[in-house]
Amino acid sequence: MEIRRADKDDLDDFVRVYVESYRGLEDYAYTRKRDVKNYFKWLLSRDKDGVMVAEIDGEAVGFVACDTNWFSIFERKKVGEIHELFVLPEFRGEGIGAKLMEKALEYALERNRKVAELWVGRTNYRARRFYASQDLRRPESGGSGSE
């Protein structure tokens, strides 16, 4: 597996992997491809170096987006905001998500962000178990439907 910085040429792969990864979790995802494309462009515009793709044999199987320009209302400073982390269902359980998270957190530290944040849907149980397995601590709940 190789993890590299994503760029605008990864748009179609991002859309494909995103849609497949969020199947069954549409309450937490964009459902129209046009919206997913705009979301990818927005992620790149926020922090182009923080968007990374995991590839196996040249095929995109997962993405992570770490935004080090994000101002946290909780921390009252810029943090490494993990906007996205997803892996194709057939590649889950192989450590790809953990490696993507590791790379995102390394990137945040390189940018002098000592705190990382993310939001996860309350009923996205697979993601919640994954983040718990990564020893991420759970802060106070915020918003409705997400933490």
UniProtKB/Swiss-Prot annotation:
Residues 1-147 form the N-acetyltransferase domain. It holds the Pfam family Acetyltransf_1. One of its GO terms (molecular function) is acyltransferase activity, transferring groups other than amino-acyl groups. CDD domains: NAT_SF. SUPFAM superfamilies: Acyl-CoA N-acyltransferases (Nat) (SSF55729). It is an enzyme of class 2 (transferase). Coiled coil: none annotated. The lineage of its organism: Archaea, Methanobacteriati, Methanobacteriota, Archaeoglobi, Archaeoglobales. Belongs to the acetyltransferase family. This is Uncharacterized N-acetyltransferase AF_0521. Keywords: Acyltransferase, Transferase. Its EC number is 2.3.1.-. PROSITE patterns: GNAT.
